[in-house]
Amino acid sequence: MWVFGYGSLIWKVDFPYQDKLVGYITNYSRRFWQGSTDHRGVPGKPGRVVTLVEDPAGCVWGVAYRLPVGKEEEVKAYLDFREKGGYRTTTVIFYPKDPTTKPFSVLLYIGTCDNPDYLGPAPLEDIAEQIFNAAGPSGRNTEYLFELANSIRNLVPEEADEHLFALEKLVKERLEGKQNLNCI
């Protein structure tokens, strides 16, 4: 069994796996539309983490992990707990970055619009402000954003995830503005 990571599963791999491959899935786009009250925010002041939205022209880069033989159900149970808060699973085709490796099926966790933590679309400025101000048990929401942006940049330098990188730029501008105010 393979699982596709497109958010924190890319850079916070706290589960056993047998193999991993960089690649992408199609027909989706990555968006910071999922609320987080258990990791990057708190009830009443949620952070924002990524989910996938259907997009016929979309392409999302990430990492596929092969779960260890004989431990698939145990690891999946852990991931089900980690990805609680409104995520459902589906199966999609994964296209490895290495063109000599054939595409194959992966399990995908998606925060759907009918879950209680789904925040949905908002102006990028508003999303950036929410990320800038949010923190939860797993840390600051800015850390999540920056780790994800850096991971995508390192794994797939040619990828131009406009939503992700535009948010990163807006949040960094806010951080620089706050530092400049502290120097006055």
From Swiss-Prot:
Protein name: Glutathione-specific gamma-glutamylcyclotransferase 2
Enzyme Commission numbers on file: 4.3.2.7
Major enzyme class: lyase
Residues bound to substrate: 3-8
Catalyzed reaction equations: glutathione = L-cysteinylglycine + 5-oxo-L-proline
GO MF annotations, alphabetized: gamma-glutamylcyclotransferase activity; glutathione specific gamma-glutamylcyclotransferase activity
Subunit annotation: Monomer.
Protein localization: Cytoplasm, Cytosol
Lyase listed as a keyword: yes
Cross-referenced InterPro entries: ChaC, GGCT-like, GGCT-like_sf
Role summary: Catalyzes the cleavage of glutathione into 5-oxo-L-proline and a Cys-Gly dipeptide. Acts specifically on glutathione, but not on other gamma-glutamyl peptides.
Annotated GO CC locations: cytoplasm; cytosol
Organism: Homo sapiens (Human)
Gene: CHAC2
Keywords: Cytoplasm, Lyase
GO biological process: glutathione biosynthetic process; glutathione catabolic process
Highest taxon of the lineage: Eukaryota
CDD domains: GGCT_like (cd06661)
Family: Belongs to the gamma-glutamylcyclotransferase family. ChaC subfamily.
Active-site residues, record numbering mapped to chain: 83 (proton acceptor)
